Amino acid sequence: MNRFLQLCVDGKTLTAGEAETLMNMMMAAEMTPSEMGGILSILAHRGETPEELAGFVKAMRAHALTVDGLPDIVDTCGTGGDGISTFNISTASAIVASAAGAKIAKHGNRSVSSKSGSADVLEELEVSIQTTPEKVKSSIETNNMGFLFAPLYHSSMKHVAGTRKELGFRTVFNLLGPLSNPLQAKRQVIGVYSVEKAGLMASALETFQPKHVMFVSSRDGLDELSITAPTDVIELKDGERREYTVSPEDFGFTNGRLEDLQVQSPKESAYLIQNIFENKSSSSALSITAFNAGAAIYTAGITASLKEGTELALETITSGGAAAQLERLKQKEEEIYA
């Protein structure tokens, strides 16, 4: 039996170094599917430790195609998997934040557990998805936003894809994506499906010395800042950790309706995002987009508070800035350099 599997079966936890070695073995296909399934199942049942997660992250980053990042880029990649079928809030908020001046490196994928993944909705919006690291950097420099399609940067994940699919439940890999941005973003807004997992991820990420990261987990189950319930926030900034709760009314939002945010397909999600940018959507959809874009603007260092960031995001949408940015992002490379 694999020695790490034996340790887990015996009820022991792994050191960060052991977890790193274990993940390296998974990424290099040096374990059988049943060994991987056994370990992932035990970890999911007992819960990972911060040391284990930090070791896994270190290995994931080592196996990824990484790019020397641009300074002060922001990622808005969350864990997904909240099961509520909302439109692509983090993708919409990334576009708004980039229109307000934030440099966004949006890390994402096609849908795995949701109705619409970030790559799916960008395709529906006719936004160019960059295919190389150089094109991503160029897009960020030109338009303040680039998209990192996860499979292009984490090719070693193919060795665990089959096992994850067969298991069918959330594993540690749901937590690793947001902590493994290929442009090594030190500023992030990370939506998490539970506050317990948010705390775990924050403890693991602290060892990598982030500049400014917000983990958000709302009490209505969204992995976003919510306008239908209070949201628990863990904020890492310049070596300090703060934990607090925000409510929609503190930011001038009336309590929204969850049904106004739900979609059944990437096409519906894209349609709703376009309506938000054209000031034709429900107040719930507008408010939640501005709230989450505000967090990205704040972590980018453009504003001094989340409230100011949210106000700037609202102004960016209502003034037509977000709609204009969407049109810029639709341009093909040959049009940009013409």
Curated annotation (Swiss-Prot):
A Pfam family the protein falls into: Glycos_trans_3N
Glycosyltransferase is among the record's keywords: yes
Residues bound to Mg(2+) 1: 90, 224
Listed pathway(s): Amino-acid biosynthesis; L-tryptophan biosynthesis; L-tryptophan from chorismate: step 2/5
Gene3D superfamilies linked: Nucleoside phosphorylase/phosphoribosyltransferase catalytic domain, Transferase, Pyrimidine Nucleoside Phosphorylase, Chain C
Alphabetical UniProt keywords: Amino-acid biosynthesis, Aromatic amino acid biosynthesis, Glycosyltransferase, Magnesium, Metal-binding, Transferase, Tryptophan biosynthesis
Catalytic reaction equation(s): N-(5-phospho-beta-D-ribosyl)anthranilate + diphosphate = 5-phospho-alpha-D-ribose 1-diphosphate + anthranilate
EC number annotated for this UniProt entry: 2.4.2.18
Subunit-level organization: Homodimer.
Protein name per its UniProtKB record: Anthranilate phosphoribosyltransferase
